[in-house]
């Protein structure tokens, strides 16, 4: 049993690729971040809360009290043979108010930080176990942005449609190179979240970003 536990906690190793197609060593993915059981219910709860928090909640309809006009009784109370009416802005009239319509509200849900972190670990672990976590030295060689070069490089890493690229905030060359590519989403390490990881088919880290993420969540650092 002890041997099984040690095996389960063994760090994963992935190759580090360079823009010219070569392999520049490997990096270890700490088991505590990239090899934990995926709690589907937890990830669903966290993603639901994240998506709810993104809603503006500014929708608003007018009730009969908000609609202008309708202050005069449309016709007398009795003697017409028709149902009594007090205002043409009542909900049953065209141009009247809305019954039980949406009003501005806050959709955000309170989610503990530990739950958010655990869900992210589960999502990353799922991608890592299926060989969908990748590490690169940089997206393009040099300091000149090149969308064509970045596209070609990513195509050698994965042929799937949705790719999450995690790079440092200061890597403007990388950002400018991939920001217009369809199906490619860019995040910095501190922006990494469960929804974007699950939405992506593959996650591509720069070594710098991977190092920053691991350092912020463990006491280890990656060296390529």
Curated annotation (Swiss-Prot):
Residues 52-109 are annotated as: Disordered. Pfam families: Ribosomal_L4. Coiled coil: none annotated. GO terms for molecular function: rRNA binding; structural constituent of ribosome. One of its GO terms (cellular component) is ribosome. Keywords: Ribonucleoprotein, Ribosomal protein, RNA-binding, rRNA-binding. Signal peptide: none annotated. InterPro entries: Ribosomal_uL4, Ribosomal_uL4-like, Ribosomal_uL4_dom_sf. One of its GO terms (biological process) is translation. Belongs to the universal ribosomal protein uL4 family. One of the primary rRNA binding proteins, this protein initially binds near the 5'-end of the 23S rRNA. It is important during the early stages of 50S assembly. It makes multiple contacts with different domains of the 23S rRNA in the assembled 50S subunit and ribosome. Part of the 50S ribosomal subunit. This is Large ribosomal subunit protein uL4. It comes from Mycobacterium marinum (strain ATCC BAA-535 / M).
């Amino acid at each position: 049993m002890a041997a099984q536990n040690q095996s389960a906690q063994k760090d994963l190793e992935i190759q580090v690729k360079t823009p010219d197609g070569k392999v520049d060593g490997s990096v270890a993915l700490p088991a505590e971040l990239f090899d934990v059981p995926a709690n589907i219910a937890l990830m669903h709860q966290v993603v639901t809360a994240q998506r709810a928090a993104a809603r503006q909640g500014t929708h608003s309809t007018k009730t009969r009290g908000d609609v202008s006009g309708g202050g005069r009784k449309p016709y007398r109370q009795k003697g017409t043979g028709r149902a009594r009416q007090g205002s043409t802005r009542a909900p049953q009239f065209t141009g009247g108010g809305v019954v039980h319509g949406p009003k501005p509200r806050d959709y955000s849900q309170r989610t503990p930080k530990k739950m958010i972190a655990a869900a992210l670990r589960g999502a990353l672990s799922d991608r890592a176990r299926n060989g969908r976590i990748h590490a690169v030295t940089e997206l393009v060689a040099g300091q000149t942005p090149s969308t064509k070069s970045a596209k070609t490089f990513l195509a050698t890493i994965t042929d799937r449609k949705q790719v999450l690229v995690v790079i440092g905030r200061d890597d403007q060359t990388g950002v400018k190179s991939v920001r217009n590519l369809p199906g490619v989403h860019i995040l910095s390490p501190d922006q990494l979240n469960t929804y974007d990881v699950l939405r992506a088919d593959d996650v591509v880290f720069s070594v710098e970003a991977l190092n920053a993420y691991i350092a912020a969540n463990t006491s280890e650092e990656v060296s390529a």
